[in-house]
Amino acid sequence: MARSVWKGPFVDGYLFGKAEASRASGRNEVIKIWSRRSTILPQFVGLTFGVYNGHKFLPVQVTENMVGHKFGEFSPTRTYTGHGSDKKSKRG
């Protein structure tokens, strides 16, 4: 279920400070974040965030198309290794 419009988008408070500090420094370094639940805002466009997936930080370059989505959507937590193969049919 979607979030109510009157509540506005959810963003952890510390992300604003990190984003502003990164913009002020002028360097495009990766901003490490653990907040997968935060919504991507227009202020974050052009910045690179390292979103934690439970194992490592995956770099996410924020574009205009990502605004309104959550950070967690762009760093998958599970790796699909495929279903087990049928060993009998592969024998020649």
Curated annotation (Swiss-Prot):
Highest taxon listed in the record's lineage: Bacteria
List the GO terms this entry assigns under cellular component, sorted alphabetically.
cytoplasm; small ribosomal subunit
**GO process annotations (BP):** ribosomal small subunit assembly; translation
Signal sequence region: none
Keyword set for this entry? Ribonucleoprotein, Ribosomal protein, RNA-binding, rRNA-binding
Q: Which HAMAP family match?
A: Ribosomal_uS19 (MF_00531)
User: In which family does this protein belong, per the annotation?
Assistant: Belongs to the universal ribosomal protein uS19 family.
- Please report the name of this protein according to its UniProt entry: Small ribosomal subunit protein uS19
